[in-house]
From Swiss-Prot:
Involved in iron-sulfur cluster biogenesis. Binds a 4Fe-4S cluster, can transfer this cluster to apoproteins, and thereby intervenes in the maturation of Fe/S proteins. Could also act as a scaffold/chaperone for damaged Fe/S proteins. Belongs to the NfuA family. It comes from Shewanella piezotolerans (strain WP3 / JCM 13877). GO terms for molecular function: 4 iron, 4 sulfur cluster binding; iron ion binding. [4Fe-4S] cluster binds at C149, C152. Pfam families: Fe-S_biosyn, NifU. This is Fe/S biogenesis protein NfuA. Binds 1 [4Fe-4S] cluster per subunit. The cluster is presumably bound at the interface of two monomers. Homodimer.
Amino acid sequence: MITISETAQAHFVNLLSDQPEGTHIRVFVISPGTAQAECGVSYCPPDAVEADDTELEFNGFNAMVDEKSAPFLEEATIDFVTDQLGSQLTLKAPNAKMRKVSGDAPLVERIEYVIQSEINPQLASHGGNIMLVEITEDGIAVLQFGGGCNGCSMVDVTLKDGIEKQLLDMFPGELTGVKDVTEHQHGDHSYQ
């Protein structure tokens, strides 16, 4: 369910050494399955363990995951990285905003999952996002850009060289292309 790197495990053991005996960590998702999903890690004293928690054993500590968060933490990773600027704990949970869908799920669900878990997080760095409007009978994914992507001068490059290439590579034989139906209006909200 959750992979915690050796350096992150050592970091947690160090942090927990200053806590009361029996304290573990809790990994959770606030508003799981929504665009506002936020992941977090906190201390979990023994009296905060719930009967329906999943307990994951690591080297020197356990991690508790509540029942509601568990499916959204599939394939999550926690790492502790140190560089010239200092050290940082990172938690990546690709399924926090949307549960992973099976390979035999309908095409629209699989594309929506890729958009929410892979494409939109990349576009978010520019304040943008895309939404799947429909998939046409001839296999065209009809998309609408929003936020900073609406009116951006680079939207055609993003669409053809980025999004279309990624989706066609992931869904060969099912998708034939992508189409942008956004009425682009350049403004203060636009990235470039």
